[in-house]
Amino acid sequence: MTLFVCGFAEIAFMKKFLLLALLSFSAFAQTSESYRLKAAAHFENGRYKEAIAALTLAIKLNPKDVKTWRNRAITYEKTEKFDLAVKDYLEVLKYDPSGETLGAIGFDYLVLEKYEEARKHLQQAITLLPTNINFRYNLALSHQYEKNYALAIEAYDEALKVDRYHTTSLFSKIRCLLRLEKFDVASVLVDSFFVAKRFDAEMLLFRGDIKLHNGATEAALNDFTRAIAINPEDIILLIRAADCLAELSQFDEEAAVRKRIVTLMEKQGETKEYRAINYGLLGFALYNAFQWEEALENLSASITLDPSATFYFYRTAVKAKLKDYAGACEDLKKAQELNPSEAENYEGYFADTAEFEEFYESCMGEV
């Protein structure tokens, strides 16, 4: 009888234990969900750091919640922490080995420049979702970034079989063709694009580059100018146009375009090396346009950012034009010091150019 009573007591205890466990799990789940909801609110308002903190707490409470792992991976991507995003997606993969998960992992590896890993996961994703154009495009990009342009073209062709109007794949394929100097093949694709009454500034850039290769500088400039009308702050287009103007000896127009370039570079926060080159090119354009004072100002800006023998040499000529022979002589010495292999040529230019005869006589004996 005692044993019988004890049995009932044990059963009652077990029921109570199970009830408490279920209640505890429910509480954890509710708390985890509340953190996930808080994270969603933070995410919507661009507070990604706070969203990550809330999702991390949710994961600690419910580590098998796939949605939370995925959300944190997406949030890490927003903060450009792609290495952490990959780790979270790999956790998701344990529970959700879908094409979407594999494709997301492949994309993050692509950004991290781990191209073999990117291809491995993207190829698996494509096997599961063969019509997903983004996976195929990213696979092609992985080859392009490694400069395997032929393989990239093959992959872009596969993407275009899925969607013949996927313009980013078409544009990237043309870039690869131009890298391989297959200008005739690229030209056919570009012309077909315009024949189909499609229009894009990027295609104008490609067509301009092809025309430049074929020596049609004025026609190329026309395409670049049309593209600039669409994208007036595109530095690449502006540089192409400026280079064409220089080739055509239209130096005043070139200088005007290069002024736009350096203004945009300052606005967009380009690297000091890139700005230095373009301040120098502006200075040289102004020199050719006989605007000595402005040329001096911009060449000096270039040298301040990143001293180079080339722009010291150009500034030598500008200072000589302005009759600052002492300053010009110092710049010539600096150019020769920075690039000894060209020292003789630098001196020879001033020796052989009649307009610098006075400067040469004043300075060359000291060099």
Indicate residue ranges for each PLM-predicted region.
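Structural marker of alpha-solenoid helical repeat scaffolds
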Residues: L61, K94-Y95, L128, V162, ...
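Canonical tetratricopeptide repeat
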Residues: L37, N71, A104-F107, N138, ...
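Register position in tetratricopeptide repeats
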Residues: E44-N45, K78-T79, V111-L112, Y145-E146, ...
